[in-house]
Amino acid sequence: MTARAKVTLHHAPNTRSTGALLLLEELGVPYDLKLVNMKANEQRSAKYLAINPMGKVPAVVHNGALVTEQPAIFMYLADLYPEAGLAPAIGDALRGPYLRWMVFYGSCFEPALIDRAQKHAATPQSMSPYGDYDTMLKTLTDHLERGPYLLGSKFTAADVLWGTALTWTTSFKLVPELPVIQGYIARVNERPAMIRGRAKDADLKATLG
């Protein structure tokens, strides 16, 4: 086995793992796809739990190692294929901002959205990982105003992550459809690999019924 052995993506169409599928399309690399039928509750089967005990998708297996958690998968894959140019290299001035926005997604954005959607009682700001929803959202939108992408003119894997997340969350009204957000979503989703990947995901969903 080598560092460039083919990646296997365990994927359920039209879920969070769609983002990982889109990233692989952006990277333009061959990969193996293992479908997880969530309608049949396959994510809770003994077979799948042996792969990912959390019973969640996406999950990536490469060189015998398991990678889970959306930002970790994105960082792993983008670094695995540096020739695609979707991750600033260590030492690049953009590496820090890139990592910031990758981690901000899981540590601030998603927790804030879940708390808001579930109408959880507000945690004191000093104890909350994201402070408060309004501060989290303003931090994001102020940064997007600088555009066109999270790292300025450079499109990276972080934009695949955030473009996918914002497409979902605005469609479910969890995030307001502000012009700055809608413009960013449009720029990300108009890319050929994103269009191709979404069509592939729709076809995969259809095969599962």
Please give the residue ranges for each predicted region:
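Short Asp/Glu-rich motifs
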Residues: 42-44, 188, 207-208
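GST-like fold's C-terminal all-alpha helical module
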Residues: 101-192
